């Protein structure tokens, strides 16, 4: 489960409502929403947000796992009965597979116009993708997952299945390291969030 002392209320509300948004979009076309679907879509949203605006969408940490970039906190939250996200989603298990449904309607209170547009863009682009297709998308050559795994010497181990998880963080800021303006925005945003968490504690 997600650690309650590590995320602000606004972060939890933003993540919860983003999951609701994705669930509503997929359910509208009768697509089941699996845990793997959401884990991959959350990463894709974060990746594109950093590349496009220089600002993390959720400010989650993602690690290199065999099945793709994974936020361990979100993985465990969706694998068990939700705690911090219990106001937003319902977890159901069917034939051993975990599916997520919205607990209430989407609220856009935590999002600006660019963020809503990004959610729309991602949901439309990947609406009919299977979990396997999303994994392949996040594993493609020169992706943050691929580059991080290669850099740390675990790419072959992960692809062969000899290793399934790691504690190696995917640093999305590396994708904008040549864009000084976006990198400055990224660092400023991270500093702001760190200060917010300090004040909370």
Named regions from a protein language model:
Residues 1-201:
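Domain-edge interaction signal
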């Amino acid at each position: 489960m997600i650690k309650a002392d590590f995320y602000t209320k606004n972060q939890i509300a933003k993540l919860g409502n983003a999951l609701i948004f994705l669930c509503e979009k997929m359910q509208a076309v009768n697509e089941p929403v699996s845990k793997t679907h959401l884990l991959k879509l959350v990463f894709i949203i974060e990746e594109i947000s950093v590349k496009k605006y220089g600002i993390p969408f959720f400010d989650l940490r993602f690690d290199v796992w065999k099945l793709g970039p994974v936020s361990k906190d979100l993985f465990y939250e969706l694998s068990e009965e939700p705690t911090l996200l219990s106001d937003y989603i319902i977890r159901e298990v069917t034939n051993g597979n975990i599916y997520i449904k919205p607990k209430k309607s989407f609220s856009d209170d935590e999002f600006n116009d660019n963020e809503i547009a990004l959610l729309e863009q991602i949901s439309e682009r990947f609406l009919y993708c299977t979990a396997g297709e999303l994994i392949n998308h996040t594993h493609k050559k020169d992706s943050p997952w691929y580059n991080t795994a290669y850099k740390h010497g675990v790419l072959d181990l992960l692809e062969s299945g000899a290793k399934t998880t790691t504690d190696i963080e995917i640093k999305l800021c590396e994708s904008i390291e040549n864009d000084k303006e976006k990198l400055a925005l990224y660092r400023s945003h991270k500093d702001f969030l760190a200060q917010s968490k300090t004040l909370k504690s």
